[in-house]
A protein has these predicted regions:
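Short, charge-rich amphipathic interface segments used for partner binding and complex assembly
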Residues: 38-67
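Intrinsically disordered, low-complexity segments enriched in glycine/proline and serine/threonine
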Residues: 11, 33-35, 50-52
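N-terminal acidic leader/helix
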Residues: 2-32, 75
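Long amphipathic alpha-helical segments
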Residues: 64-78
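Short E/K-rich amphipathic alpha-helical oligomerization segments
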Residues: 27-43
Length: 78
């Protein structure tokens, strides 16, 4: 991504966040992870931690893409 301008990065990230397939994929993964966590035995700490970690990583990915859009927007404003 070194060759992309800030504007190109912002536009690409916004396209991802607005893409119905991308949104569906995130929502589906979040639901599947929650269901997987809910179905684990209370003493299956390893599986619960795996679900928790996957959920956090999914959130971080979305937050990173969102921050690219916000950074591009702020660069335009300033």
């Amino acid at each position: 991504m070194e060759n992309m301008t800030q504007e190109e990065r912002e536009r690409g990230a916004k396209l991802l966040l607005d893409n119905p397939l991308f949104v569906e994929a995130f929502e589906t993964l979040e639901k599947e992870l929650l269901l997987s966590w809910a179905r684990t035995n209370s003493n299956d700490v390893s599986q619960r931690e795996s679900c928790w970690l996957a959920t956090r990583l999914l959130e971080r990915l979305k937050a990173h893409i969102t921050s690219i859009v916000e950074t591009g927007h702020m660069a335009k404003v300033l």
